[in-house]
């Protein structure tokens, strides 16, 4: 490129590859698919250049198509020439250019804006003549003209001397972004007489935007034959990289057969299940938030208290935001410390220092490079490609000849900075630039058949209870284990006897305040009309022993001992269910059989639950083992809303505990409520017709010591992943994950109806945990062993339907518990997508999953596999692929295999399997994968100004690991520091 008449040409010029140096008209369409070459009018200034649409397959590590606009940012010619004159690389020149190489550098410093404008017009005239030539010139001249045309469209890439320049040389076409605010001092005419209409409406706003323009750099001194050969190879490579992946559609699950069955009777009417035929197919994919019904956002992060109780609301919870105080400062320091530790995937110190210097000088002129195929020696820094407006991970600054000199405020000041002594150094740099290094290709996961319904280790090979478990010790009460039955009288098939024989009352802040307690007083009027404190339990008995033939009778009975809420509680859902949903025969069976039996078992509470039930408070490691009959009595009391002190809001005594009384289940006209009531009445009918004989254990586990994730050297365990089936249906005998609210049960007693609430409905014995389990802290979980499934269902959220009664055939262990182990672990609720990639948030989720999976003192061969899925996604805002990787890492440290259910998402199934296979084949440790997660945040998410980063997590990991592997295999090189 010429600097115009009377100006000395650049001593360093950019090199262009074979695609750029071939004859323009002949190779333009081949080398740059989609590029539209314009014949520029000499009067047009400035010139607008169009960005070729890039394929998602060719752009390294990018998810989706190129986000550049078709009308890219207009670059001013003086700006380009200034960069070229100071930092350019030598290139082949035409005869007119060679005649100017002997000019004095003083002329370069005296260049004026007029001369620039003259050159601008001169250059456009040459570009205009390109389309009119017969292409009979020499290859050098043709390449020169084609070179000039593209030099007006993009910035020159300046490569530093030394190893860094060699690493930059290795890269394929970088995207160059010019920061327009930093050229405010350039003496260039900013007006444009003629241009497309798309640019005239955004002349002023264009200066505040950044666009990416693709530039090809190559060695112009190579012969044309070599260039043509490289061009052919580049076409072959691009064809492979751009090959579209076959779309794989997930198979839809078949709808559950409709059985005409009533939850109130084994021979119920046919109309109870009429809504099942039209129900939507099972959609358990919690990560599909976009199609969630209006209630789904309320249900999963449901508050166990009223809507005004912000403390108990997961959506309004402040606890989730307290995870990382000092969001930027604390995470920057912690992630920086981790990054300084030895690793196979550690970026080089030179690149780190360069990134720090470039990001700290916002007023300087910067070029942002997006690498497509190249790789730095550490193999990691080039993966970061930011959206416009974000800070790039690799900023190459314009520097003087010594690379560390003072920066001028004007680009034209650089013209006076090229001493003659630099000629020798430039020649040496030029020789280094000609050295080509092996390029690191983009990693593409192997193609997986779309017909596969599962991937990984066969589920039959996964460990299950009780076969993999050890023999349990004799059941005995201890300081950290409360047992409420006579262990000496425990027999198979017999109803356990309560212990002690007679009711023992403790009315304090360490135990559940029971409805039958003598301390449960209530203001009553005596015969003289005077108010006195009476027994509330006696009032409950009197109210419930009346005939409950109508829903209004049940409402009046409940409000008799809850007078304070007579004007607050709403029973619309209960009344509508009784009058509009149930058939006459079903309603008759309800008030003639089921409700009287429920009243009977509820009022037998002091004879069934004789031992005070301890509260499972925070920081406790304690277990409670009770009989299924005792749980049924407690839940019957919850249905009739008899538990005292559990209805107050805000800062009351039990404000840190979930709801237990069912009053919120009776309110409103939601279509969910009738189905929830059907499921619960099915349970009460079953347990009142035949007393259950098993035991259930509730364990609160609180950990103080967690792994140092960045130093963990354990390898990943086995994985089975499928898009069919459910956790409860196909994970028998495994550790089944409950995607819990920190108030266990979430909205099960109100409007919630997603994964956790559904599990609590079909296994209603889980609901009693809300009676004594305080809100979970970040280092805690709740483990429930022995609950029984009583119902089957179809649908999810708004489409949930009770289907039929279920006979649980799970085996029992030595303690007469069903071998169904459920762990409640609560994920964080992310209001911003990027927040979940903050290092401390990732550590918190790892620690939470690890807490749920760990069983201290139990060897790995005696631990069952973890049956899980899209934990913390859906309404909680989590990324399914990140959460899957987090659970895989936590399970590896806890020495458990993983069985992962994607709930109908076949693409997610293939992605998780491909990532797990990729990591295990390369024998990456948990610590190395954890460091990659930190790298992803630092390079892609920390400074991202858009809702989500351009490069997704899995492509980033693929490229990072593959790049490091390729670089390590090169002789004479080593990675990390």
From Swiss-Prot:
Modification type Phosphoserine: residues: 69, 138, 198, 262, 265, 287, 292, 299, 303, 317, 449
Cystine bridges: none
GO CC annotations, alphabetized: cytoplasm; nucleus
Chain intervals with Low complexity compositional bias: 17-29
Keyword terms, alphabetized: Acetylation, DNA damage, Hydrolase, Nucleus, Phosphoprotein
Classification via Pfam families: PARG_cat_C, PARG_cat_N
Region A-domain, residue ranges: 1-457
Positions of the UniProt region annotated as Disordered: 1-69, 184-407
Catalytic activity: [(1''->2')-ADP-alpha-D-ribose](n) + H2O = [(1''->2')-ADP-alpha-D-ribose](n-1) + ADP-D-ribose
Compositionally biased region (Acidic residues): 317-332
GO biological process: one example: ATP generation from poly-ADP-D-ribose
Residues at the catalytic site: 738, 756-757
E.C. no: 3.2.1.143
List of residues that carry Phosphothreonine: 200
Sequence positions that bind substrate: 727-728, 741, 755, 796, 870-875
Biased composition (Polar residues): 280-291, 333-343
Effect on the protein upon substituting residue 756 to N: Abolishes catalytic activity
Subunit structure: Interacts with PCNA. Interacts with NUDT5.
UniProt record similarity statement: Belongs to the poly(ADP-ribose) glycohydrolase family.
This protein's domain notes: The PIP-box mediates interaction with PCNA and localization to replication foci.
Biological function: Poly(ADP-ribose) glycohydrolase that degrades poly(ADP-ribose) by hydrolyzing the ribose-ribose bonds present in poly(ADP-ribose). PARG acts both as an endo- and exoglycosidase, releasing poly(ADP-ribose) of different length as well as ADP-ribose monomers. It is however unable to cleave the ester bond between the terminal ADP-ribose and ADP-ribosylated residues, leaving proteins that are mono-ADP-ribosylated. Poly(ADP-ribose) is synthesized after DNA damage is only present transiently and is rapidly degraded by PARG.
The name this protein goes by in its record: Poly(ADP-ribose) glycohydrolase
High-level lineage: Eukaryota, Metazoa, Chordata, Craniata, Vertebrata
């Amino acid at each position: 490129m010429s600097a115009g008449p009377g100006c000395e040409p650049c001593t360093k010029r950019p090199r262009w590859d074979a695609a750029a140096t071939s004859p323009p008209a002949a190779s333009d369409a081949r080398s740059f698919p989609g590029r539209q070459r314009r014949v520029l009018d000499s009067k047009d200034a400035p010139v607008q250049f169009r960005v070729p649409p890039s394929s998602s397959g060719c752009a390294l590590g990018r998810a989706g198509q190129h986000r550049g606009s078709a009308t890219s940012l207009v670059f001013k010619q003086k700006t380009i020439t200034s960069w070229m004159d100071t930092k350019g690389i030598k290139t082949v020149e035409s005869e007119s250019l060679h005649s100017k190489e002997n000019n004095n550098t003083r002329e370069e410093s005296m260049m004026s804006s007029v001369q620039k404008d003259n050159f601008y017009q001169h250059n456009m005239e040459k570009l205009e003549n390109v389309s009119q030539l017969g292409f009979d010139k020499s290859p050098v001249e043709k390449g020169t003209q084609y070179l000039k045309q593209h030099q007006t469209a993009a910035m020159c890439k300046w490569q530093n001397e030394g190893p860094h320049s060699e690493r930059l040389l290795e890269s394929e076409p970088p995207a160059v972004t010019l920061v327009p605010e930093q050229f405010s001092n350039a003496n260039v005419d900013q007006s444009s007489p003629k241009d497309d209409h798309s640019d005239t409406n955004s002349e002023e706003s264009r200066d505040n935007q950044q666009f990416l323009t693709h530039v090809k750099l190559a060695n112009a001194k190579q012969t044309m034959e070599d260039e043509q050969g490289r061009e052919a190879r580049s076409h072959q490579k691009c064809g492979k990289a751009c090959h579209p992946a076959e779309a794989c559609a997930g198979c839809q699950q078949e709808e559950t057969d409709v059985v005409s069955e009533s939850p109130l009777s084994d021979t119920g009417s046919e109309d109870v299940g009429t809504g099942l035929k039209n129900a939507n197919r099972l959609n358990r994919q919690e990560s599909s938030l976009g199609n969630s019904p209006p209630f789904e956002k309320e249900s999963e992060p449901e508050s166990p208290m009223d809507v005004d109780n912000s403390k108990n609301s997961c959506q309004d919870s402040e606890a989730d935001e307290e995870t990382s105080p000092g969001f930027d400062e604390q995470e920057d320091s912690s992630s920086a410390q981790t990054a300084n530790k030895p690793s196979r995937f550690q970026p080089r110190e030179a690149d780190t220092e360069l990134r720090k210097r470039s990001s700290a000088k916002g007023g300087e002129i910067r070029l942002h490079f997006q690498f497509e195929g190249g790789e730095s020696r550490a193999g990691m820094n080039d993966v970061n490609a930011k959206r416009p407006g974000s800070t790039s991970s690799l900023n190459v600054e314009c520097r003087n000849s010594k690379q560390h000199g003072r920066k001028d405020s004007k680009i034209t000041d650089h013209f006076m900075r090229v001493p003659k002594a630099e000629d020798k150094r430039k020649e040496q740099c030029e020789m280094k630039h000609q050295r080509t290094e092996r390029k690191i290709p983009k990693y593409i996961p192997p193609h997986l058949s779309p017909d596969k319904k599962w991937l990984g280790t066969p589920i039959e090979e996964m460990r299950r209870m009780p076969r993999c478990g050890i023999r349990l010790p004799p059941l005995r009460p201890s300081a950290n284990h409360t047992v409420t039955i006579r262990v000496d009288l425990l027999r198979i098939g017999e109803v356990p006897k309560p212990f002690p024989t007679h009711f023992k009352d403790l009315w304090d802040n360490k135990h559940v305040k029971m409805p039958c307690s003598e301390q449960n007083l209530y203001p009553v009027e005596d015969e003289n009309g005077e108010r006195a404190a009476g027994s509330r339990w006696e009032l409950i008995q009197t109210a419930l022993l009346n005939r409950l033939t109508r829903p209004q009778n049940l409402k009046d009975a409940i409000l008799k001992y809850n007078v304070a809420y007579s004007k607050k509680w709403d029973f619309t859902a209960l009344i509508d269910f009784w009058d509009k949903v149930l058939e006459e025969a079903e309603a008759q069976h309800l008030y003639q059989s089921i409700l009287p039996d429920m009243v009977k078992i509820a009022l037998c509470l002091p004879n069934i639950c004789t031992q005070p039930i301890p509260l499972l408070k925070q920081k406790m490691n304690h277990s409670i083992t009770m009989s299924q009959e005792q749980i049924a009595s407690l839940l019957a009391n919850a249905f009739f809303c008899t538990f005292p002190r559990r209805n107050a809001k805000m800062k009351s005594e039990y404000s840190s505990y979930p709801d237990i009384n069912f009053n919120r289940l009776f309110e409103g006209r939601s279509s969910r409520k009738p189905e929830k009531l059907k499921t619960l009445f099915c349970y009460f009918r079953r347990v009142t017709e035949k007393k259950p004989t098993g035991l259930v254990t509730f364990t609160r586990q609180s950990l103080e010591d967690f792994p140092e994730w960045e130093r963990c050297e354990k390898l990943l365990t086995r994985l089975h992943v499928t898009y069919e089936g459910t956790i409860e249906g196909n994970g028998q005998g495994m550790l089944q994950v409950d995607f819990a609210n920190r108030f266990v049960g979430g909205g099960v007693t109100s409007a919630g109806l997603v994964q956790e609430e559904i599990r609590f409905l079909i296994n209603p014995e889980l609901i009693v945990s809300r009676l004594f389990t305080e809100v979970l802290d970040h280092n805690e979980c709740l483990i429930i062993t022995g609950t029984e499934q009583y119902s089957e269902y179809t649908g999810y959220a708004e489409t949930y339907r009770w289907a039929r009664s279920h006979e649980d055939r799970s085996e029992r262990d030595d303690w007469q518990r069903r071998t169904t182990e459920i762990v409640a672990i609560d994920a964080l609720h992310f209001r911003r997508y990027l927040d979940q990639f903050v290092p401390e948030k990732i550590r918190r989720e790892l620690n939470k999953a690890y807490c749920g999976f760990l069983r201290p003192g139990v060897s790995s061969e005696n631990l069952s596999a973890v049956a899980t899925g899209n934990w913390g996604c859906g309404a909680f805002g989590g990324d399914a692929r990140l959460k899957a990787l987090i659970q895989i890492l936590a399970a590896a440290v806890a020495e458990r295999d993983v069985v992962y259910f994607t709930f109908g998402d076949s693409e997610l199934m293939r992605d998780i399997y491909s990532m797990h296979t990729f990591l295990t084949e390369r024998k990456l440790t948990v610590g190395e994968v954890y460091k990659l997660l930190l790298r992803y945040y630092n390079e892609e998410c920390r400074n991202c100004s858009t809702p989500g980063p351009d490069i997704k997590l899995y492509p980033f990991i693929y490229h990072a690991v593959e790049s490091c592997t390729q670089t390590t295999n090169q002789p004479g090189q080593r990675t990390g520091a």
